[in-house]
Amino acid sequence: MTTDFCPGYPAPYDGLVADYPDVSVYPADGFRVEWGPIFHRGRLDGSASVLVLGQDPAVLETVARRILVGTAGQRTQGLLTKLGLTRSYTMVNTYLYSVWGQGAADRHVNDPLIAAYRERWLTALIAHNDIRAVLTLGTLAATAFTAWRATADGAAFTGQHAALIHPTYPESASASGQITKAEATKRLLENWNAAIPAVSAAIPSPDQPPTGVPYGDDFTAADLTPIPAGDLPAGLPAWMRGARSWGVRTGADPDTKRATITVTVPPDARPWM
């Protein structure tokens, strides 16, 4: 059996992953630095036409060592499928590390050293790919991208920018009581539907024809796309690419929960049963 996999980090990205900011830049009271940095997902071979800028890695990303593989990743992958993209994309996050605690994400988005490293990635990706569109997921990503656009390198970018509502906005907004989950999902999908025509027009040669099927008022199974094996490190099992959540932080107190991730193989992926 032949299985595709992410080949790793060629130049110039090898220099970026070798020289990443540590706890002296990302404070431990705001980020889960103990789990290490998580850099990207997608193509680093110069073939990307779309750049996705996310927020920060969550539980599943921490295990898989690539960004946007959980719920947000499945929804984002589905959006790329609607755009006709199966390979020609690349993704980075606003933050290298998972955010810890209330307010840390907003407090640190403009920290000079955090921003400087993030902007090195954005500059390298856009310099070494024919990026026609940038999709920012949520307000933090839009803020980070706008800040990069104000730099000399960013000012030279002439592609499309689609500022999208974050893929897990329905869960976060409804949990805080701002809005019902159904209403929040409808708002999200209206935002995504509105962005699709301009982004599609900016991509002259998608990997396959765009689906032409807009979102409805809620996500359906057809709107979610499994993470491609070629986006993940060699050897990760196929069930880590699917829509089911297989990892969760566990513990009786905040410190234990921060230090512990429990991974469970889904029942239908247990060959001994």
Enumerate the predicted regions with their spans:
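A polyanion-binding, active-site-adjacent surface
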Residues: M1-M273
